[in-house]
Every structure is written in structure tokens, then in C-alpha cells.
Amino acid sequence: MENKKLIERCETELAKVDRPGADKLLAYIRKSDFYTAPASTRFHLSCPGGLLQHSLNVLDALRGLLDWNEGTQEWEYRVAGHVVDSTSDESVIIMALLHDLCKTHFYGTSMRNVKNEETGVWEKKPYYVVDDKMPLGHGDKSALLAGKYIELSCQELYAIWHHMGYSGQDYSAAQAIDHSILKYPMVLALQTADMMASKLLEDNEGNRFDSAAALVG
């Protein structure tokens, strides 16, 4: 899918966020490198537009994990048939599309010599590096950035803040994540959707499946 179509879809989804400051949030996203940055330096979607693609993939994965309740007009998170949490579609959009807002102004490029296997000639090729212009953490930075423009619910705040799960966490941080999941199970749902997208939907240069990040709803 062309980057232009991904941008259109992203902005269509963000237009469903009806909160004071949503226009300023969109202005920040447009002025930043959110639409052009990679999702990583060398793992999933380490390509131009990877961050945008990944964010939409997480949105699709999160909606796919949840069940829509027509009566309450909410998404329900079920475990073994039991509803453990629920949320609005607006919140799903916020959690998924803004979970990696921290990766804006985060990457740069450098050059390295790479041998052309066909010609045997060494050529200079660009590659992505971390150049964090706002060193404020990861999930916590995403929550702080989003919160500058729109008011986040506690559920949204916890989910975005802890979306990296237990990766690289010490004991006290892991305990905080445990308590957060019990308080707001949607934390675990967003963690799972993020992993599903990065590990199962995405390769280094694009999606594994053509249908990933297709229009939903």
C-alpha cells in the first residue's frame, strides 16, 4: 500500500478522536517524521514509512483481539469467554496509533560500506541509527507526548506507558506492569497486539501479508 494511502487511513482514524486538542495532535504528527520514519533500525519495518505502517498494523491487531459489542458500542477484551476489560473504538485508536509516538524525532541515518555481490565493488549505503532528540524513555515518552495535546483516560495512559511489556525491566518495574495489567487488562491487549504486529505481520522492508493494515470499520 502506498504511503499516501496509509496517511489517509491514519488521518481518517484519528478524525474519529473527538477530544479537545485532537487538531493540535494531528498538527504535531504532520510536522514530525511520523509518516516517514522507520519502525526500527534493523528489525521490523526498518524502512521509510515503517512507523506509520506499524501503528496501523497494531490498530488492526488490537481490533482483531477484541470483540465488538453492538449493544454497548464498545470493544470487549475476553479471556476464556470472560469479559475482563472493555473500551471505546476511540480509545482503541488512541492506544494503537499513539503507542509509538515516542519514535518521532528518534531515528537518523548514517553511511556504511556494503559490498555489491554482483560487481564485487564496495558501495556506500545509508542505514538507520538511533538519534533520540527527546531522550525521555519509550512508552512513557509516548504517553507524555500524547498527553500534551489530548487528555488520556487512565486505561489509555497505562496501556501506552507499559506497551513494551517486560522487555528490559527490573523487578520493581515488572511489578508495576503486573499491577497495571490487573488494574487495566487492556494493557496486556496492547502489548499483545504490538508483538503480533512486529513479529507476525511485519518483515524488515514491509508487511508479510498484503491484507495487513487494510481498511477496517
Model regions: which residues?
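Amphipathic alpha-helical segments within well-ordered protein domains
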Residues: E11, L59, R63, A143-G147
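Short intrinsically disordered terminal tails
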Residues: M1, V216-G217
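A short alpha/beta connector and helix-capping loop motif
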Residues: F209-L215
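Divalent metal-dependent catalytic cores for phosphoryl transfer on phosphate-bearing substrates
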Residues: S40-C47, G71, R78-F209
